[in-house]
UniProtKB/Swiss-Prot annotation:
Note on domains (UniProt): 2 residues (Tyr-53 and Arg-56) present in a large hydrophobic pocket are probably involved in substrate specificity. They are important for desuccinylation activity, but dispensable for deacetylation activity.
Record's protein name: NAD-dependent protein deacylase
Cofactor binding summary note: Binds 1 zinc ion per subunit.
Entry annotated with the keyword Metal-binding: yes
Chain residues that bind NAD(+): 8-28, 86-89, 177-179, 203-205, 221
Keyword Transferase: yes
Residues noted as binding substrate in the record, renumbered to the chain: Y53, R56
């Protein structure tokens, strides 16, 4: 069986990673998300944007994969599994999943905003949240930015291409913890359905996908995913 997993913020929220809408420590609560996650916000105040992302980087480093992440990784022993994620954390990888296609980038990868060269140098230490942090500087003189897809930016070509390939070849797509409103990622479930794959939605809340999904499970990832692989044949018949 070939399984494509599309994961969103809900699965990581169970590990203590705030969702994007909640991911603002008191220092940044007064800022609109656009100010912290856009090229315009970066141009206006790169120190503030860097401070916010560096705080998120260290926050995620301190949490652990949950039962949902571990279940998906365990499926690899019984099926061909590809993970497509809208999340910018590394919890799928730490649980053991391979491959993982990050559609929106990663909090653990950085690049020069000017020349795009990847940055693997030291990061500023952060014992506690700081409103503004000076970004590292590339050899070309450009500032180092998080390798994250900001508002208005295109998805990275290679992860998107591989996500589409995994979706097109899947027998089953499991959509977990995503609102199903952020495109183009939300269109992957529609693509899977159009190609005859079963789409299983795992989400405590009703989403725009719920009406068309083959099966909707109103549970969290850590509740539904352990044991789901063994239950799939009966659930889908």
């Amino acid at each position: 069986m070939r399984i494509a997993v599309l994961s969103g913020a809900g699965i990581s929220a169970e590990s203590g990673v705030p969702t994007f809408r909640d991911d603002k420590n008191g220092l940044w609560a007064r800022f609109d998300p656009y100010e912290l996650s856009s090229t315009q916000g970066w141009r206006d105040n790169p120190q503030r944007v860097w401070g916010w992302y560096l705080w998120r980087h260290y926050l995620v480093a301190d949490v652990a994969p949950n039962a949902g992440h571990r279940a998906i990784a365990a499926w690899q022993d019984h099926a061909e599994v590809s993970v497509i994620t809208q999340n910018v954390d590394d919890l799928h990888e730490r649980a053991g999943s391979r491959p993982v296609h990050h559609l929106h980038g990663s909090l653990f990868e950085f690049r020069c905003a000017r020349c795009a060269k990847p940055y693997t140098g030291e990061l500023p230490a952060m014992a506690e949240p700081a409103l503004e942090v000076q970004p590292p500087v590339c050899g070309c003189g450009g500032l180092i930015r998080p390798d994250i897809v900001w508002f208005g930016e295109q998805l990275p070509d290679e992860p998107w291409r591989r996500a589409v390939e995994a979706t097109e070849s899947a027998d089953v797509m499991v959509v977990v913890g995503t609102s199903a409103i952020v495109y183009p990622a939300a269109g992957l479930a529609e693509l899977a359905l159009s190609r005859g794959a079963a789409v299983v939605e795992v989400n405590p809340e009703v989403t725009p996908l719920s009406a068309s999904a083959t099966l909707s499970i109103r549970e969290t990832a850590s509740q539904a995913l352990p044991g789901l692989l063994q239950r799939l044949p009966a659930l889908l018949n």
